[in-house]
Amino acid sequence: MLITISGPAGSGKSTVAAGLAESLGYEHVSGGDIFRDLADDRGLTPLELNKRAEEDDQIDRDLDRKQRDIAESRDDIVLESRLAGWMAGEHADFRIWLDAPLSVRAERIADREDKSVELAHNETKERGKSEALRYREYYNIDIEDRSIYDLALNTARLSPDGVRAVVESAVNAYAPDDDEGQTPVEGVTYEF
């Protein structure tokens, strides 16, 4: 089974994806892992590649193509990134969206990255706007469209263990024989 976990920065997707993969005995592949591999392939550090990505849209496209390739060719995996649900498309068996209010996500990011909440809030807000524009421009994806997801959860309402329990319960309850059809991923331009 291919499970995707998507959501904005600070939503808890990495924490939940790692825990879910561990409990299922699946491999966890994150967009961050793929990005680090791309940096390695180019002989760059992730920070250097990130700087180049600001000027070169092909870097984002390479990351997204890798996600799509993984979704097409692998199974028993939890694929996690902002666009994992969209990039996996019809190959995903179960798509999950995690979110939290911007103020909560900013606090989490500030704690994780040892910066002020105000700075994290401003950076996260700007990053979200920038990503939304790029996703629309590159692939015709409206990142605010949650219709493709089988489960959407506000992670601010539960502890990390509570979020993981809800996600695990939903995934374990999923039975392919009872599946009457997932929402198709339509209108996306997979041009990398």
Swiss-Prot record:
SUPFAM superfamilies: P-loop containing nucleoside triphosphate hydrolases. GO terms for cellular component: cytoplasm. The keyword Cell inner membrane does not apply. It catalyses: CMP + ATP = CDP + ADP; dCMP + ATP = dCDP + ADP. It comes from the Archaea. Keywords: ATP-binding, Cytoplasm, Kinase, Nucleotide-binding, Transferase. GO terms for biological process: pyrimidine nucleotide metabolic process. Pfam families: Cytidylate_kin2. ATP binds at residues 7-15. Its EC number is 2.7.4.25. InterPro entries: Cyt_kin_arch (IPR011892), Cytidylate_kinase_dom (IPR011994), P-loop_NTPase (IPR027417). It is found in: Cytoplasm. Belongs to the cytidylate kinase family. Type 2 subfamily. This is Cytidylate kinase. The gene is cmk.
